[in-house]
Amino acid sequence: MTPVVALVGRPNVGKSTLFNRLTRTRDALVADFPGLTRDRKYGHANIAGYDFIVIDTGGIDGTEEGVEEKMAEQSLLAIEEADVVLFLVDARAGLVPADIGIAQYLRQREKTTVVVANKTDGIDADSHCAEFYQLGLGEVEQIAAAQGRGVTQLIDQVLAPLGEQLNADQAVENEENSANEEADEWDTDFDFENEDDTALLDEALEEETEESIEDKNIKIAIVGRPNVGKSTLTNRILGEERVVVYDMPGTTRDSIYIPMERDGQQYTIIDTAGVRKRGKVNLAVEKFSVIKTLQAIQDANVVLLTIDAREGISDQDLSLLGFILNAGRSLVIVVNKWDGLSQDIKDQVKSELDRRLDFIDFARVHFISALHGSGVGNLFDSVKEAYACATQKNSTSMLTRILRMAADEHQPPLVNGRRVKLKYAHPGGYNPPIIVIHGNQVEKLADSYKRYLSNYFRKSLKIIGSPIRIQFQEGNNPFAGKKNKLTPSQLRKRKRLMKFIKKSKK
């Protein structure tokens, strides 16, 4: 399961700055769910090879009536959900009573807590941070979140002790990256025009991903806003009342994993808690965790994003969709409650979906009624199609041919007067499909050309329902950093030119 890291502390100690640094976004948001609690933000991060979910909370100000009684509820829930709590303090402001109160609360919760002294740039960090050892929470880590100094080392030290939970995630990533490393080693020795050489490379790449592809149990996560019919759809798929259904948002509090078999194929259906709007649910229902939904997305092979046809697509849906795409999961759009709508309303809903979801035209869209069962059976065809596309094996020779066809039809743009050269492509991973393109100056390719390549590969490989990721590897220049040694005649000529230039300036 993806680990969870919560950022807590007083106001203005740099929690949001660190959140932005970890999630690599400037809007403090990778998956924003306004209304879960007023100031909590969720994001997906990958630092030092570790995948994790990070929670940014509002500042805790307990200086007036005590932290124990006035701890902000969003921070309380974040602490409960987290595997590790990063307790941020301000190294410049020093230790204040609110820090002591927060530390006392954290010690009572017996959560893995790391004290992080932020804003250590431009000061004698060791002397300023010494007083934070009074908090009794162990070592004090020093960072400067605004500049990013110490952040990678912090995450490496914090997440490494989680052991097996993280090793499994890191092993999957290593499997995807190992193919890239092998191809880099063979770049100069292999002839990618030679079928025997490319066959050997493909065989090596297959060994890295064979185990994950051969897992035939397809995990399907059903996600969406509250009361869009997720549990009703789950029960309709299962053919029995396995999940409580009630016409009130927030009935499902946790992610429920249910195994099933259909036409000889093993599935695991994951019914998740809804992601609700601000002020739409009462305090008792607010205790369910959206973290479970985010983790279910990470754990799934295919995600069914369920939308209420009567309410249309909302910003909540788009936020959730962004998290699904960032996680690289296959996607099927399910528009529920389609029954009983007039043809004019149906046309209006379809037009709105086309307008707001034009950037995911690769995903199948199904219009169903989970209550009556119409259209539900067709979902499995799209699920199997998306999973097959996400895990299909492509040879190096095929990908290289497609790359050259794309370059022939639309040549890469000039960079500083030189044409970007695309050498070859090979598979770099599966679920989602990763294509690694090697060449010269590829890091300078315009985003528009990268999108062109992505769309060209998708069309050529007929990938439906799955995002596709393209990574670029710069070819090593053997002459980089080297200077030609001038001959004596060249040195004399250079001196004459320098003298001429100096005289001209006078």
Swiss-Prot record:
GO molecular function: ATP hydrolysis activity; GTP binding; ribosome binding
Protein name: GTPase Der
Domain EngA-type G per the UniProt entry, residue ranges: 3-166, 218-391
Quaternary assembly: Associates with the 50S ribosomal subunit.
Residue span(s) of domain KH-like: 392-476
InterPro entries assigned to the protein according to its UniProt record, in alphabetical order: AAA+_ATPase, G_ENGA, GTP-bd, GTPase_Der, KH_dom-like, KH_dom-like_a/b, P-loop_NTPase, Small_GTP-bd
Positions bound to GTP 2: 224-231, 271-275, 336-339
Keyword Repeat: yes
Similarity comment: Belongs to the TRAFAC class TrmE-Era-EngA-EngB-Septin-like GTPase superfamily. EngA (Der) GTPase family.
Coiled-coil annotated spans: none
Gene Ontology annotations of biological process type: ribosome biogenesis
Chain's role: GTPase that plays an essential role in the late steps of ribosome biogenesis.
PROSITE patterns with a match to the protein in the record: G_ENGA
List of residues binding GTP 1: 9-16, 56-60, 118-121
Keywords associated with the record: GTP-binding, Nucleotide-binding, Repeat, Ribosome biogenesis
Protein source organism: Actinobacillus pleuropneumoniae serotype 7 (strain AP76)
